[in-house]
Amino acid sequence: MRLNTLSPAAGAKSAKKRVGRGIGSGLGKTGGRGVKGAGSRSGGGVRAGFEGGQMPLKIRMPKFGFYSRKGAVTAEVRLSEVAKVEGDVVDLNTLKQAGVITKGMQFAKIVLSGNIDRAVTVRGVSVTKGARAAIEAAGGKIEE
């Protein structure tokens, strides 16, 4: 076997569809595009979700809810990441300096994931019930 003798397996590649080449091909005259309408024209077609003028499903369904913009500037911090912060005080600035959260974050919440084995003081950062218990069990405290 040589590189110049390699070829695809028989039946692996199908021949290109040749449209508009006689009625015997099954794709003659209109070339599989049907008769008249936007889909038959060159460059034609309808956008995704268009239902021929009928009120689209997306608009027929009721509107509900909204996306809170606060979620985009709130970081979720694991307890194991809090342990990486140097110093005894954990606040928004120390979390940013340690590289735990990005500089665009305005709020943070510490969640119980992992463990902490030293006492830290959490200041100005919200904490879940489980994380609060773990921090206090390690000798730390939470200041609102």
Curated annotation (Swiss-Prot):
GO term, biological process aspect, one: translation
Name used for this protein in its record: Large ribosomal subunit protein uL15
Biased composition (Gly residues): 21-50
Alphabetical keyword list: Ribonucleoprotein, Ribosomal protein, RNA-binding, rRNA-binding
Reported function: Binds to the 23S rRNA.
Pfam families membership: Ribosomal_L27A
Entry-linked Gene3D superfamilies: 3.100.10.10
Domain of life, per lineage: Bacteria
Gene label: rplO
Cellular component per GO, a single term: cytosolic large ribosomal subunit
Organism: Tolumonas auensis (strain DSM 9187 / NBRC 110442 / TA 4)
